[in-house]
């Protein structure tokens, strides 16, 4: 037997094969999962900011156009109906102090 035919000068008869990518197992790659998570986060943030800056004001505006002012929507009705007394004689007026509209703030 000839020793030169059995052994070559190179350690490997052929260069080793290096796989270009891992075989797919039918699942999403991690980069795609990361893209989906980032897209979901940005979408939720955009919807929250849209609600905070635009949609809430539009709803208040539509309710105010139906006859109620925005102050009534936020703070409740401006005037309360009188409360009936326990003995039924006459209604008791609202205990809150009246608003003074005669103050002139231009002299301050």
Swiss-Prot record:
Family (UniProt): Belongs to the mastrevirus movement protein family.
Pfam families in UniProt: Gemini_mov (PF01708)
Compositional bias per record (Basic and acidic residues), positions renumbered to this chain: 99-108
Disulfide bridges in this chain: none
Superkingdom per UniProt: Viruses
Organism for this UniProt entry: Panicum streak virus (isolate Kenya) (PanSV)
Any single biological process term in GO: transport of virus in host, cell to cell
Record keywords: Host membrane, Membrane, Transmembrane, Transmembrane helix, Transport, Viral movement protein
Chief localisation class: host cell
TM spans (from-to): 35-55
GO annotation, cellular component aspect: host cell membrane; membrane
Annotated region described as Disordered, given as residue ranges: 1-25, 73-108
Quaternary assembly: Interacts with the capsid protein (CP). Part of a MP-CP-viral DNA complex.
Function text: Involved in the viral transport within, and between cells.
Localisation per UniProt entry: Host membrane
Name this protein carries in UniProt: Movement protein
Keyword Transmembrane: yes
Keyword Magnesium: no
Bilayer topology: Single-pass membrane protein
InterPro entries: Gemini_mov
């Amino acid at each position: 037997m000839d020793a030169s035919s059995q052994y070559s000068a190179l350690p490997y008869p052929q260069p080793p094969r290096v796989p270009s990518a891992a075989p797919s197992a039918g699942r999403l790659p991690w980069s795609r999962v990361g893209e989906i998570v980032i897209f979901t986060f940005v979408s939720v943030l955009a919807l929250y900011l849209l609600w905070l800056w635009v949609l809430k004001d539009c709803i208040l505006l539509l309710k105010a156009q139906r006859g109620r002012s925005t102050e009534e929507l936020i703070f409740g009705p401006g005037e309360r109906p009188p409360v009936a007394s326990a003995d039924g004689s006459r209604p008791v007026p609202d205990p809150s102090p009246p608003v003074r509209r005669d103050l002139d703030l231009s002299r301050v």
